[in-house]
């Protein structure tokens, strides 16, 4: 995937910005005492709702507000500056925040369009931007040279974007999206040394690369601007282990410890819930393909880290059965997603002060 191509998650974000989604039929407005510091929602958490394309039309920001969320991750800001100003005013009146996903400039010819989008994001009052520039490394690449060439291309793209970010004082948060181990992402950002480029820390993604979530967080901590909060479950399967988002509080993460650490760094950090309701992901650590991009000292995966991860899997069987969506009707899948998001939101409010 090139740095400007759209992942499944970004396509959902695009749809979230374009499709008007209904409240649940039985939903009543949910209070949000934390306002814009309360938990927000990442676009990938709305996948079932977007696909359902229900008939009732409710603006996505209104949906999030009515459902008690403090922020929303969406695709592009309004291209018209008057509309951008209206969005900024609306966010202020609702006491909410927004995070946008904007394609980065793959070539110098793309800088003008990127500049216009960053200006629009700035005028909209964006909290920051997010970019997920990789797929799952162990699926995307079959050898180290191809992985490394992609990484170098991404570095060049971000360096090309940085002057425009600095011009408008808009921050870009790069998600740890199962593509880079945390030490190599941190080393890159240290070398780049820009206050405008940092990390959107996903609580669970780097388990797939044999890292403990707290290790990932600590390695990336100096650069974290925002977070995708989630809880994770793991269980063995024949080629490795399964990795699944589960309700907040039902997984293996020490959420309170992690939230406290992130808030200590930045009391105003934006937490967006990413409770993706889907089949568990297969992490095939016993296959040759998984290890194909880790056979070079520039990007190692030590055997010690594999052993620690397998021990984590062994010692943490799922507390409850992990979610499955295969065979569900669209209506049932939508209800399951709504229920999961609502339960996780309520847990975050009660136990994490979000």
Question: How would you name each of these model-derived features?
Answer:
Residues 3-5, 9-16, 20, 26-38, ...:
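Histidine-acidic metal/acid-base catalytic patches
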Residues 17, 22-29, 94-98, 105-198:
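Active-site acidic/histidine proton-transfer and metal-coordination neighborhood
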Residues 31-34, 61-66, 81-99, 115-126, ...:
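Acidic (Asp/Glu)-rich catalytic clusters
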Residues 37-43, 72-74, 98-102, 129-131, ...:
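Hydrophobic faces of well-ordered beta-strands that scaffold small-molecule active sites
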Residues 48-53, 74-84, 104-112, 139, ...:
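Acidic-and-aromatic substrate-binding clefts and catalytic sites of carbohydrate-active enzymes
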Residues 50-63, 110-119, 210-216:
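Short, acidic/polar
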Residues 58-78:
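Catalytic domains of carbohydrate-active enzymes, especially glycoside hydrolases
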Residues 60, 117, 150, 154-161, ...:
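Alpha-helical packing segments of well-folded alpha/beta enzyme cores
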């Amino acid at each position: 995937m090139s740095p400007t191509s759209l992942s499944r998650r970004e396509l959902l974000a695009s749809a979230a910005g374009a499709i008007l989604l209904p409240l649940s039929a039985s939903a009543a407005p949910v209070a949000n005492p934390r306002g814009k510091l309360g938990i927000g929602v990442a676009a990938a958490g709305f996948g079932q709702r977007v696909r359902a394309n229900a008939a009732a039309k409710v603006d996505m920001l209104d949906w999030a507000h009515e459902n008690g969320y403090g922020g929303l991750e969406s695709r592009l800001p309004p291209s018209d500056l008057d509309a951008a100003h209206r969005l900024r005013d609306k966010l202020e009146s609702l006491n909410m925040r927004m995070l946008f996903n904007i394609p980065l400039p793959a070539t110098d010819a793309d800088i003008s369009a990127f500049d216009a989008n960053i200006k629009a994001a700035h005028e909209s009052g964006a909290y920051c931007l997010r970019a997920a520039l990789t797929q799952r490394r162990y699926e995307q690449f079959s050898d180290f040279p191809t992985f490394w060439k992609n990484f170098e291309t991404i570095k060049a793209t971000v360096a090309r974007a940085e002057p425009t970010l600095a011009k408008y004082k808009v921050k870009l948060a790069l998600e740890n999206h199962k593509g880079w181990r945390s030490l190599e992402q941190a080393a890159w950002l240290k070398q780049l040394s820009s206050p405008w480029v940092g990390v959107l820390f996903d609580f669970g993604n780097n388990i797939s690369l044999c890292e403990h979530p707290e290790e990932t967080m600590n390695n990336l901590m100096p650069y974290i601007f925002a977070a995708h909060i989630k809880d994770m479950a793991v269980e063995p399967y024949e080629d490795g282990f399964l990795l699944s988002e589960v309700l907040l509080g039902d997984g293996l993460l020490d959420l309170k410890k992690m939230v406290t650490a992130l808030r200590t760094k930045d009391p105003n950090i934006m937490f967006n819930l990413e409770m993706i309701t889907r089949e568990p992901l297969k992490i095939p650590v016993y296959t040759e393909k998984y290890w194909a991009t880790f056979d070079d000292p520039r990007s190692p995966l030590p055997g010690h880290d594999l052993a620690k991860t397998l021990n984590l899997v062994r010692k943490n069987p799922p507390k409850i059965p992990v979610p499955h969506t295969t065979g569900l009707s669209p209506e049932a899948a939508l209800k399951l997603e709504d229920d999961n998001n609502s339960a996780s939101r309520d847990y975050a409010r009660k136990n994490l002060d979000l």
